[in-house]
């Protein structure tokens, strides 16, 4: 089966990367993997992937190079740093970046990679969290040449229920910024709602089912409100650190574009405050703890 499928390589085996790789392996794709910490590489090697020691080895055989990394700096290091992908990259390959990165930096890196070795870049950040990665129901927002995105569609269909081309390189990252503005502001309001319901004597565990199907309903509400009501913060499905990074990107982008985003600016400061109290690596459901102290 794998002989007729393109060979893939994947860098970044975090909360999202591992389940995404598992879906690609289950579909029969030949897959090489790299992660900074070897434990995740070994985990997927035991499931059929080829583990490599440095990112450059990913580009030796793969037709499609995939990244799912923490931030813009990590993407730049894996692609252009010592032992990076650029050392073995060649014309005809495609690089697909699932990371949430800065749009301007994405455009710059894409131009540099194509100029240096002829590899084209598609930014394809995703939304749907670990449940979406596990079930293959992610929403994928892509930026790049239309032909390149169509070439990727069969592979990406294993990972997402919807792939939308938003424009040229960088457009996917702009769309992800918009997505994260909505998600992060929503998470903060849900935390306020949960704490208020508790203090007013309402069973906060009933809020999400009571509002289901109404105008206030959302996936974040249905996921976060029950966790907050139960103070159930494990296992960590996403990180406060990630939301803060994305809000900072939103504020930076709005400044560059001359756009007003006051709610996201305030959300960034509230998220930073929460992170400074030891919650950066915790689940955003912990945001409710910020509001459980009475205001006299």
Range-by-range predicted roles:
Residues 1-67, 98-99, 108, 130:
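NAD(P)+-binding Rossmann beta1-loop-alpha1 motif at the extreme N-terminus of oxidoreductases
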Residues 55-67, 71-120:
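Rossmann-fold NAD(P) dinucleotide-binding segment
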Residues 100-180:
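Rossmann-fold dinucleotide-binding core
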Residues 135-142, 164, 168-200, 209-223, ...:
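Active-site-proximal catalytic alpha-helix in oxidoreductases
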Residues 205-213, 265-269:
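Beta-strand segments within the central parallel beta-sheet cores of soluble alpha/beta enzyme folds
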Residues 219-280, 284:
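Interdomain hinge/lid region at the active-site interface
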